[in-house]
A protein has these predicted regions:
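Primarily recognizes the serine-hydrolase "nucleophile elbow" in alpha/beta-hydrolase
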Residues: 85-151
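Catalytic histidine-centered segment of alpha/beta-hydrolase-like enzymes
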Residues: 186-198
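Short beta-strand/loop motif that positions the catalytic acidic residue
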Residues: 149, 154-157, 161
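Short alpha-helix in the alpha/beta-hydrolase fold that links the catalytic acid
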Residues: 149-151, 165-173
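Short glycine-rich catalytic loops that host catalytic nucleophiles or stabilize transition states
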Residues: 66, 181-187
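Serine-hydrolase catalytic machinery in alpha/beta-hydrolase-like enzymes
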Residues: 6-8, 12-100
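Acidic catalytic loop of the alpha/beta-hydrolase fold
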Residues: 159-164, 188-189
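A domain-start/cap signature at the N-terminus of enzymes
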Residues: 1-5
Length: 209
């Protein structure tokens, strides 16, 4: 892992790079849970996803949202965080003479981070750019206006989530005819269920080149 800061619109953004730098199969942009409730890029769900995508051969990019770690600024409940993730992705695309710009990219997030990634996808789509896939875990559908997502998005939610009730995510997914993978017995933070979460992602990628 390497950590560094890059220029953002309101000051530095702290990012971490994990995995394959030389010849990755793609780039994963990974977003953490709500910063005002202790969310950081070192959250256990986030690091589980990071390790899973590293195992799959990706370059994984995490960043701290505004006001967390070495990232400047104050929490904006979505708009500024969306801008910052787009800044991070653009920075990665311009690294090493643009070697990563032509690779597939994945947008992944947990809780508040999933909400932000849904809006990152909308902004990118307006530029004609589309992720290889999205992975949204414990999506904060009961607390923020989560945008519609592509039909192949992997949505994972805990059966016993009392932070974001499963029903709210089902209600969000239903009009989109979007499947939701429910982990029996899992709470919002997937305590004791992180290996299951990892296997769900690995299985979703099984057979992909």
């Amino acid at each position: 892992m390497s950590k560094l800061t890059i220029p953002g619109t309101v000051g530095p953004i702290e990012i971490a790079l994990d995995g394959e730098l030389t010849s990755p199969r793609g780039v994963v942009l990974l977003a953490h849970p709500h910063p005002l409730f202790g969310g950081t890029m070192d959250n256990k769900v986030v690091t589980t996803l990071m390790r899973t995508f590293v195992q799959l051969g990706y370059l994984v990019v995490r960043s701290n949202f505004r006001g967390v770690g070495q990232t400047a600024g104050e929490h904006t409940a979505g708009p500024g965080e969306t801008d910052d993730l787009l800044t991070v992705l653009d920075h990665i695309w311009h690294m090493d003479a643009g070697r990563y710009a032509t690779l597939p990219f994945v947008l992944a997030g947990f809780s508040f981070g999933s909400f932000v990634q849904s809006h990152v996808a909308v902004r990118l789509a307006a530029q004609g750019k589309h992720p290889q896939r999205m992975v949204l875990v414990g999506t904060a559908t009961s607390r923020w206006e989560v945008a519609p997502v592509p039909a192949d998005t992997l949505v994972v939610h805990g059966e016993l989530d009392d932070t974001v009730p499963l029903q709210s995510t089902l209600d969000w997914a239903r009009p989109q005819s979007l499947p939701v993978v429910v982990v029996p017995g899992a709470d919002h933070f997937f305590h004791g269920k992180l290996p299951t979460l990892k296997q769900i992602v690995l299985q979703a990628w099984a057979g992909q080149a």
